[in-house]
Amino acid sequence: MKYGVSQLSVVPGREEPSDPSEMVTQILFGEHYKIIEERAKWVKVRLSYDKYECWIDRIQAFEVTKDVYNAIETSKSWATSIDLAAIGIDINKDSMIPLLMGSSLPNYENGKCRWGENVFEFSGMTVKSESGISREKIVDNAMMYVNAPYLWGGRSPFGIDC
């Protein structure tokens, strides 16, 4: 079995291994998955958080070891981005990555999330998994989705599925 984690802002998950195939979900930054099937240009993944299966373009898949996957899976130090959009910095590549609200920040401490050798700096607003979130903040976040356009499989205020 192979494993992966999204290192891109958002990756389209498709019904079939084909560019014109409908998008059925989106994988946000920091979400991890198991690779359950491979083709020349495509990999089929099973998302950890909801067990949803979809195809992603191989060039958008980032493989990690089983140990790294398990470390993410069992991490007690999670955070989630709650800014509409924010900037993350890939420390190893010195490059910026836009992060959408709901992006996962595994092993998050002191403004950085990490998996394996990969370290990302994040200065946006977060909610840490162990701290919970207030009712008021849930309502504030929900309001960011008001007037969001409908997008089949979408998972952000820039396009959301029902």
Tell me what each language-model feature is:
Residues 1-3, 25, 29-34, 39-40, ...:
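Boundary regions of SH3-family modules and the immediately adjacent low-complexity/disordered segments
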Residues 7-9:
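OB/S1-fold single-stranded nucleic-acid-binding modules
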Residues 20:
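Intrinsically disordered, low-complexity polar regions and short flexible loop motifs
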Residues 150-154:
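Surface-exposed patches in mature extracellular/periplasmic domains of secreted proteins
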Residues 156-162:
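Active-site nucleophilic cysteine motif
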